[in-house]
């Protein structure tokens, strides 16, 4: 039983996509996205420099571009399996999952992601102090619940930090005030010394996503979701105990999305300022639903890395 994984924001889509620009399907898909978004995605890719120290393009460009790149690669390099049973996206990657499962049209997803990115950028601009996101990874090869529990306890002592992503037993992402994030890094290094070394990485994003700081984005995103139509055809759905579900795992609940447009809209709205429970998403699709073949699509290697931390090996095409 197969599942496909899609990455979120923060991947280096520009240099990663350069080798694929000569592919006609990739070219046509990116051109299609450019017509919808009016963003020169291919120009950003062509002009990117390998190993550049320049920041990634702003959120309003990066989010639609990463969605477009993920779908371009899926179209150009279709999987060996004809149809995936499950679709799992990380944050922004959920929108790629909706397109791949044919629950959302490509053009509708691009418009919705553009609205999402603008709303999130607006929320970030309202913050009085600099905010960011910080990935905290325990480099020990032996996962332990003690690490996550230690981080949870430490975060409670910081007034301006939220949990943004729980990616695995060894990796968690924090969102919040940049000064407090700098402070908690040294605190955690001491607290987890007995468990292993700590590695911290700033995410190349423009704000504290998946946190309380995104609440001002709610109204604008809610309106955009309300204008978006989702395809909930019976052949896409699972039926369990008389209820219908989509084959897409929700970041908010780590369960299948209900086959109901209002439920979909509600969860995608919550996802903007709630933590991404990706560790549990992978656990659900593997342990509860028996997925044993995982494909990682989209630019970058983030999905392969997180899957590996969760004991899952992935196939990548390309």
Swiss-Prot record:
Record-annotated membrane-spanning stretches: none
This protein's pathway: Lipid metabolism; fatty acid biosynthesis
SS bonds (residue pairs): none
Coiled-coil spans in chain: none
EC top class, as a word: transferase
Catalysed reactions listed for this entry: holo-[ACP] + malonyl-CoA = malonyl-[ACP] + CoA
GO cellular-component term (any): mitochondrion
Keywords per UniProt: Acyltransferase, Fatty acid biosynthesis, Fatty acid metabolism, Lipid biosynthesis, Lipid metabolism, Mitochondrion, Transferase, Transit peptide
Gene3D superfamilies in alphabetical order: Malonyl-CoA ACP transacylase, ACP-binding, Malonyl-Coenzyme A Acyl Carrier Protein, domain 2
GO annotation, biological process: fatty acid biosynthetic process
SUPFAM superfamilies recorded: FabD/lysophospholipase-like, Probable ACP-binding domain of malonyl-CoA ACP transacylase
Location in the cell: Mitochondrion
EC number: 2.3.1.39
Pfam families named in the record: Acyl_transf_1
Biological function: Involved in biosynthesis of fatty acids in mitochondria.
Name of the protein in question: Malonyl CoA-acyl carrier protein transacylase, mitochondrial
Organism listed in the record: Schizosaccharomyces pombe (strain 972 / ATCC 24843)
């Amino acid at each position: 039983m197969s599942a496909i994984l899609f990455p979120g924001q923060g991947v280096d889509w520009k240099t990663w996509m350069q080798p694929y620009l000569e592919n006609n399907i990739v070219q046509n898909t990116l051109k299609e996205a450019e017509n919808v978004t009016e963003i020169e995605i291919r120009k950003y890719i062509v002009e990117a420099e390998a190993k550049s120290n320049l920041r990634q393009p702003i959120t309003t460009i990066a989010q639609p571009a990463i969605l477009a790149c993920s779908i371009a690669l899926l179209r150009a390099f279709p999987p060996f399996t004809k149809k995936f049973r499950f679709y799992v996206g990380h944050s922004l990657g959920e929108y790629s999952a909706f397109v791949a499962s044919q629950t959302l049209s490509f053009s509708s997803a691009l418009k919705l992601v553009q609205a999402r990115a603008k709303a999130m950028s607006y929320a970030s601009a309202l913050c009085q102090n600099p905010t960011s996101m910080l990935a905290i990874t325990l480099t020990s090869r032996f996962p332990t619940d003690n690490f996550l529990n230690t981080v949870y306890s430490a975060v409670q002592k910081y007034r301006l930090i939220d949990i943004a992503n729980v990616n695995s037993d060894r990796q968690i992402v924090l969102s919040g005030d940049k000064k407090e994030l700098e402070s908690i890094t040294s605190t955690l290094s001491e607290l987890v010394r007995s468990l292993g070394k700590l590695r911290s990485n700033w995410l190349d994003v423009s704000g504290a996503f998946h946190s309380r700081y995104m609440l001002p984005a709610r109204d604008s995103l809610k309106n955009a979701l309300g204008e978006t139509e989702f395809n909930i055809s019976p052949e896409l759905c699972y039926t369990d105990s008389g209820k219908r579900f989509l084959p897409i795992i929700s970041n908010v609940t780590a369960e299948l999305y209900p086959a109901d447009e209002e439920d979909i809209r509600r969860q995608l709205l919550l996802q903007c300022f709630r933590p991404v429970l990706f560790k549990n998403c992978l656990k659900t699709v593997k342990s509860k639903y028996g997925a044993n073949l995982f494909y990682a699509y989209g630019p970058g290697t983030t999905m392969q890395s997180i899957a590996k931390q969760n004991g899952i090996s992935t196939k990548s095409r390309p």
